[in-house]
């Protein structure tokens, strides 16, 4: 899927829209493969699932290297369209094992790759940074 299609996709493209109230959100923290902590907030906005991320340690270094501002929105991969509501998505993040997150720059977009185990199965989940 190209960036434009990803940015314009909605849950109805993948099935039922998530059951959530406007601007409903949950937060959690992950440690990246760079050993820094990242605080994530999952937000529902008009039936689209967005992920907001903020680096807790060395934020100025992160901004300098990537040229992005503090308040960026990340849209979740289609993977999460399978989940019924925000609590299910939050539960997914709190129950996964062996979390490892990495960031890469690709065509001026930041790709967040989350490698983890869910029920002993390796999963690779990617988020794309929205400008």
Regions found by a protein language model. Give the residues of each.
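A structural signal for beta-rich interaction modules in eukaryotic proteins
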Residues: 2-130
